[in-house]
Amino acid sequence: MCGWPLLVLWALLPATAAGSPGRSYPHRVVLDPEGKYWLHWGRQGERLAFRLEVRTNGYVGFGFSPTGSMAAADIVVGGVAHGRPYLQDYFTNADRELEKDAQQDYHLDYAMENSTHTVIEFSRELHTCDVNDKSLTDSTVRVIWAYHHDDPGESGPKYHDLNRGTRSLRLLNPEKANVVSTVLPYFDLVNQNVPIPNKGTTYWCQMFKIPTFQEKHHVIKVEPIIERGHENLVHHILVYQCSSNFNDSVLDFGHECYHPNMPDAFLTCETVILAWGIGGEGFTYPPHVGLSLGMPLDPRYVLLEVHYDNPARRKGLIDSSGLRVFHTTDIRRYDAGVIEAGLWVSLFHTIPPGMPEFHSEGHCTLECLEEALGAEKPSGIHVFAVLLHAHLAGKGIRLRHFRKGEEMKLLAYDDDYDFNFQEFQYLREEQTILPGDNLITECRYNTKDRAVMTWGGLSTRNEMCLSYLLYYPRVNLTRCSSIPDIMEQLQFIGVKEIYRPVTTWPFIIKSPKQYRNLSFMDAMNKFKWTKKEGLSFNKLVLSLPVNVRCSKTDNAEWSIQGMTAIPPDIKRPYEAEPLVCEKAASPPLHGIFSLRLLTCALLLGSMLSSQGL
C-alpha cells in the first residue's frame, strides 16, 4: 500500500519526528499551568501553521473565541486513533453546543502519537470566508485549548472537564531577524524573591537604576528571564522610563502597582520603553536602530512592572523573573525614541456607565508635530513598532494617521484588545511621520457592568487611551497628547457655574441647585445616564476642542503646550481593500499525498514501537 514512500519515510524519520519537513515555528508558548500543552506557530504567506504537543493519547482541541469562553468559538479537534490521524473543523453556537463545520478549512500536515504524547501539525488560511471561522488579523486572539485522554467516539469528542483553558496571543506579530546574544554584554532588570499573593491578578513594581557607562551604548535586544516553572505565572512585563531627578533611595523596595500606598516616585514613570508578553521571544530592534544608554538624556531610572496571573490562587509562590537587556558599543546608525501619543491621563477623560460601546480620542496634533519635528527633523521620523494601551474597560484601540486631511494606512490596531496582554507590535513596513501630520489614538470601551462614571487615571479601574511609538531618529518629543474641554462636558449635564478661583480638586459646582457644592465628579455620577444620553455625550466629546500637550524630556514643554486645537477635518478616510471571498477550492493534491504519507508514517511508527525501537 505504501510502497516506495515507506522507504522515503524511513530515511526521513529522524527529521520528521521533530516536525514536518521544511516547516519552522518562530513562536511558542505553554498554555497550561503544568506544562502539558505546548503551542508552536508561524506564518506562511496567507496561511498560519500550528504545531500542538500535548501530554495525552486522546484528542487535542484548539480554537479561537471572541471572549475566551466556548461560546461562538472556532474549534479544531485532532489526534491519532487506532493508528490513523484525524483532524476535524468544528464551531460552537451561542449556547456552547459543538457542531461539525460543513466547510472544513483546517488541513492536517503531520500527526504522531507515542506512549505519552500526541503531536499534530496543521494549517489554515488567515481568512477562510467561512462565517463559522474567525479571521486571523493583527488583533489579539483569545486562544482556547482542551484535551481528553480518549479519542472522539461516534457522538463526537467527550467533555474535557478541567483540561481546558484560554490565553490571549498576537499570532501575526512579524518575527524579526534574531541577534546572536551569547557574545553581547547585558544587564538584568529582575525581581528578587517577590511573594505572589494568592489572588488572581497581581501587578508588582520595582525601580532599577541603569548601569553607569563611560561611553554610549545601544540596547539592541531584550529577552524575558522567567523563573523555571513560572512560565504560566508571569503574564507580561513593562519597563517605564522614570524621572532622572532621584537618588538611589528609590531603589530600596518594590511594591504592588496602582496601590494607594505605593511610593510617589512610581508616579513619575510614565513612558513605556520596553515590553514583553507571554508567548513572545523578546524584542529585537531593527539592525539600523538601537536604544541609547549612557548619554545625558537617556534613561537613568526605570520601573519594572510585572503582571502575575494566578487563577488557581496558589499559595507560597516566590518569583524572581524579569528582563535581560543586551547592549553594545557598536553603535548603530540611529537612536530609537519613544513618543507617548493619545489622551493625557486626567479626570477630564470621562466615560459614562452602562455603555456597551463608547469611543474616546486622543490627538497628537498637527500643531505639536509641526513645531517639534519642524525644529528637530523636518524630513520626518520613522515608526517601526507600536504598543497600544488602555485599561480594563478597553475593548479596541486604533492608531490613525492623517496628512493634509487624508487618512493614511493605520499605524497599528487591536480590535480585540486585552489589558492582560500587551506587547509592542512590529510594523511590517516602517511608516514616516512628517511635520504637520495628525495622529489619533482611538479607543473603544465597554462599561455595561459599571454603575458609576469611569475616569482617566492610573488605577486599572480608571482608564487610559495611549499609543507608544518606537521610532528613529530620536527627537526631543516624549509626549504628544490632548485633553478634551471639561466645561463643555459639564454643560451637557446642566452645570452652569463653578466656584472661582479654583482652590480645591476636584473643583466644586456652584449652580444649578441640584449640583451645588458637589465636586464635578459627584455631579457627573449624580446625572441619570441612559444609553441614549451616553451616545449623545459621546458625539459631543468627540467634537470638542482639545488642550494640546506637547512635552520634551523631563517634562520640559514645547511652546504649543496648553494651546487649544480643533480635531482634524477628515476629508478622505482610509479605505482598506475589501476581502473578496470565492468558492472554496478542493484540497491540493500535495495535501492528499501528505495524508498518505502520514498514514504510512503512523504504520511505520507502530512497527518500530512493537520492535522496541
Swiss-Prot record:
<feature type="binding site">
    <location>
        <position position="389"/>
    </location>
    <ligand>
        <name>Cu cation B</name>
    </ligand>
</feature>
<keyword id="KW-1133">Transmembrane helix</keyword>
<feature type="signal peptide">
    <location>
        <begin position="1"/>
        <end position="19"/>
    </location>
</feature>
<feature type="active site">
    <location>
        <position position="203"/>
    </location>
</feature>
<feature type="disulfide bond">
    <location>
        <begin position="443"/>
        <end position="465"/>
    </location>
</feature>
<keyword id="KW-0479">Metal-binding</keyword>
<dbReference type="GO" id="GO:0004500">
    <property type="term" value="F:dopamine beta-monooxygenase activity"/>
</dbReference>
<keyword id="KW-0503">Monooxygenase</keyword>
<comment type="similarity">
    <text>Belongs to the copper type II ascorbate-dependent monooxygenase family.</text>
</comment>
<feature type="transmembrane region" description="Helical">
    <location>
        <begin position="588"/>
        <end position="608"/>
    </location>
</feature>
<feature type="binding site">
    <location>
        <position position="235"/>
    </location>
    <ligand>
        <name>Cu cation A</name>
    </ligand>
</feature>
<dbReference type="InterPro" id="IPR000945">
    <property type="entry name" value="DBH-like"/>
</dbReference>
<feature type="disulfide bond">
    <location>
        <begin position="242"/>
        <end position="269"/>
    </location>
</feature>
<dbReference type="InterPro" id="IPR000323">
    <property type="entry name" value="Cu2_ascorb_mOase_N"/>
</dbReference>
<feature type="binding site">
    <location>
        <position position="464"/>
    </location>
    <ligand>
        <name>Cu cation B</name>
    </ligand>
</feature>
<feature type="disulfide bond">
    <location>
        <begin position="364"/>
        <end position="480"/>
    </location>
</feature>
<keyword id="KW-0256">Endoplasmic reticulum</keyword>
<dbReference type="InterPro" id="IPR014784">
    <property type="entry name" value="Cu2_ascorb_mOase-like_C"/>
</dbReference>
<dbReference type="GO" id="GO:0005789">
    <property type="term" value="C:endoplasmic reticulum membrane"/>
</dbReference>
<keyword id="KW-0732">Signal</keyword>
<keyword id="KW-1015">Disulfide bond</keyword>
<feature type="disulfide bond">
    <location>
        <begin position="205"/>
        <end position="257"/>
    </location>
</feature>
<feature type="glycosylation site" description="N-linked (GlcNAc...) asparagine">
    <location>
        <position position="476"/>
    </location>
</feature>
<dbReference type="Pfam" id="PF03351">
    <property type="entry name" value="DOMON"/>
</dbReference>
<keyword id="KW-0472">Membrane</keyword>
<protein>
    <recommendedName>
        <fullName>DBH-like monooxygenase protein 1</fullName>
        <ecNumber>1.14.17.-</ecNumber>
    </recommendedName>
</protein>
<dbReference type="InterPro" id="IPR024548">
    <property type="entry name" value="Cu2_monoox_C"/>
</dbReference>
<feature type="topological domain" description="Lumenal">
    <location>
        <begin position="20"/>
        <end position="587"/>
    </location>
</feature>
<dbReference type="InterPro" id="IPR008977">
    <property type="entry name" value="PHM/PNGase_F_dom_sf"/>
</dbReference>
<feature type="disulfide bond">
    <location>
        <begin position="368"/>
        <end position="550"/>
    </location>
</feature>
<dbReference type="Pfam" id="PF03712">
    <property type="entry name" value="Cu2_monoox_C"/>
</dbReference>
<feature type="glycosylation site" description="N-linked (GlcNAc...) asparagine">
    <location>
        <position position="517"/>
    </location>
</feature>
<keyword id="KW-0560">Oxidoreductase</keyword>
<dbReference type="InterPro" id="IPR028460">
    <property type="entry name" value="Tbh/DBH"/>
</dbReference>
<keyword id="KW-0325">Glycoprotein</keyword>
<feature type="active site">
    <location>
        <position position="389"/>
    </location>
</feature>
<dbReference type="GO" id="GO:0005507">
    <property type="term" value="F:copper ion binding"/>
</dbReference>
<feature type="binding site">
    <location>
        <position position="307"/>
    </location>
    <ligand>
        <name>Cu cation A</name>
    </ligand>
</feature>
<keyword id="KW-0812">Transmembrane</keyword>
<dbReference type="InterPro" id="IPR045266">
    <property type="entry name" value="DOH_DOMON"/>
</dbReference>
<feature type="binding site">
    <location>
        <position position="391"/>
    </location>
    <ligand>
        <name>Cu cation B</name>
    </ligand>
</feature>
<dbReference type="InterPro" id="IPR036939">
    <property type="entry name" value="Cu2_ascorb_mOase_N_sf"/>
</dbReference>
